[in-house]
Curated annotation (Swiss-Prot):
NCBIfam families (UniProt xref): F_box_assoc_1
Species annotation: Arabidopsis thaliana
Domain F-box: from-to ranges: 4-50
Name used for this protein in its record: Putative F-box protein At3g21130
Source domain of life: Eukaryota
Length: 367
């Protein structure tokens, strides 16, 4: 006689408690299995517990042919050989709500903050997107978006409210000024208007995108009409909705074209790379007054224009492009390796790499 199987049904609260310890990438795979799992992944209770208890993963994404891809960059040392690879492991699918056939959106630029992607499209639209939960919010402008606009996504550290910064450089005024607006997710509207004078963010490579660290965004900027070495670190504080000028390491003068920014794992620390001397500096302490303590982390014996930090300081691995807009990468560990990204098209290029930390954070709710 066959024994009857005893089916154990877990309460939804217990399921949420269990899943709050599972990585966001693993939970994202559950969305396609059933409507119930899809709804649970988007549940506010799970999002809050997951933020507190789940392991955080630092991954890499890249923009290729207007699509966002996950990239696996591996550099492992064995006894007799080094195992290294850079492969595209998956594509994030962002459907266009204006398309009857739900075609995918053509993405121009991507900005990452705490698991959310702020994407500007080639037809000048703006969307905030969580690839893990599939949640999106299309942001309507007060006035039409422009190709020249600069965008950043962050959050208020006091209220945990998401916000978007939009900057528009007004070149028809003398002196040149940068007008900016701030979108508040709680009110679902553009609430702040301001003008920032005396600064300039050149349109050079990927430097114009800025980087998010603990909710705030940082750029390398120049003093308006100043010499090329009159450079400073510009911060937009989403708690005060204002700009701050911060200090850079001052031991070696260099021009704007010789410096780039990156972040360590999970957007915890800001990094500055100086191609003149090939030095990597890490911001170890940031004061509200604008002062920053910098520590020199690494020095390389070759010239690099822009670098992405992919590993922590205990086992440093750095990646940079062999040539701009190419699919050839340098991987730097104990030695230098040049590899080609394994991708679907030999003609496709990797314009830049971004550190991406998946999460279940909800766009409509607080972080």
């Amino acid at each position: 006689m066959m024994k009857k199987r005893n089916t154990v049904y877990l309460s939804e609260d217990l399921i949420v408690e269990i899943l709050s310890r599972v990585s966001a990438v693993s939970l994202a795979r559950l969305r396609t299995t059933s409507k119930r799992w899809n709804a649970l992944v988007k549940d506010e209770r799970l999002a809050k517990k997951h933020s507190a208890y789940a392991p955080r993963q630092s991954l890499v994404i890249t923009l290729i042919d207007s699509r966002v891809y996950l990239m696996n960059v591996s550099l492992q040392y064995g006894i007799e050989k080094v195992d290294l690879s850079a492969k595209l492991t998956g594509q994030f699918s962002l459907k266009d709500p204006l398309s009857n056939s739900l075609e995918e959106v053509d993405i121009r630029n991507v900005f990452h903050c705490d698991g959310l992607l702020l994407c500007s499209t080639k037809d000048n639209r703006l969307v905030v997107w969580n690839p893990c939960s599939g949640e999106t919010r299309w942001i309507q402008p007060r006035s039409s978006y422009k190709v020249s606009d600069i965008y950043a996504l962050g959050y208020d550290n006091t209220s945990s409210c998401h916000k978007i910064l939009r900057m528009d450089r007004s070149e028809d005024r003398i002196p040149i000024q940068t007008e900016y607006q701030v979108y508040d997710f709680t009110s679902k509207s553009w609430l702040v208007d301001g003008v920032a004078g005396g600064l300039f963010i050149p349109s050079i490579g990927t430097r114009r995108r800025g980087l998010s660290v603990k909710g705030n965004t940082y750029w390398l900027a120049l003093t308006e009409d100043g010499p090329p070495f009159d450079m400073f670190l510009l911060c937009f504080d989403f708690s005060t909705d204002g700009f701050r000028r911060l200090s850079l390491p001052t031991d070696t003068p260099c021009t704007y074209y010789d410096v780039s920014l990156s972040v360590t794992r999970e957007e915890q620390q800001l990094c500055m790379f100086k191609s003149h001397g090939s030095e990597l500096w890490i911001a170890t302490k940031m004061e509200s007054t604008g002062a920053i303590s910098w520590s020199k982390s690494h020095r390389f014996h070759f010239r690099i224009d822009e670098m992405t930090v992919l590993a922590d300081q205990e086992k440093p691995v750095f990646v940079y492009r062999f040539k701009p807009k190419s699919n050839m990468l340098h991987i730097v560990g104990e030695h230098i390796y040049i590899i080609q990204v394994d991708q679907h098209s030999a003609d496709s290029k990797c314009p830049y790499l971004l550190t991406y930390v998946p999460s279940l954070v909800q766009i409509q709710q607080s972080i």
